[in-house]
Amino acid sequence: MCIRDSIESGADVTAAYTKQPIPEGVRSSYEKTNYLHYTFSMAGQKISKIFVNSEENGVQNVSMNIYVMERQLLIDEIKKGFVLGNKFFERDVLAPQTEKLNIQGYEFTGYQARIDDMKSYFDENMKLLKDENLDSLFSGNPIYTKVRDDNPTRYINGSKAKNVMVADGCVIEGEIENSILFRGVKVAKGAKVKNCILMQDTVIEAGAEIEYVVSDKYVTVSEGKQLKGTDSFPVFIAKDQVV
């Protein structure tokens, strides 16, 4: 839709944006990561001004950092930017040229998420446990990913599962609730998993209890261990760690 609108409008550049308040995590991310966020002032569909790291409250036209433009124009701007020592496309190339270039806005109204820290990663993933968000994000278009042929997930007698998204190759003997499990996760008998995101080949051993945990690949939570974060501060376990 954005590409079609860009062609039909004759714009030099079309920028996708959403109407929403600036997310709190985005406001504070610059001090930690030098990440810049952008908002637009609109005159009809034309972007008349681009603001960098705006502190305005209320609903804004927030950039999605998605732009459609002709290949040759992009090449020309990159060459000029290289000579001038520019570093940021939006700040150094587009923002100074809102009068020179025809920069049009495209409002995106579907599901979108801005992930810039562990908290937002956890929150946005957990939202996918709601059918309306999942259906909006995966709306029939194919998803291309790495192929790993595996067995269907097995739920052993006595296991319990409630409101979960589980990939193939998992073995569930314990209890899982409000959680997302990547491929090959194993939850042993007597283990309890709640409000967690467990990445590929994580192993939760017998009797372990975890809550509000994000585990990277190949993590093992040892037998009988308890590990609990909170919804505002999920615990992260790095790749290959044994807890």
Model-derived features: positions:
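Left-handed beta-helix
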Residues: Q72, K80-V243
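Unchanged
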Residues: M1-N125, I237
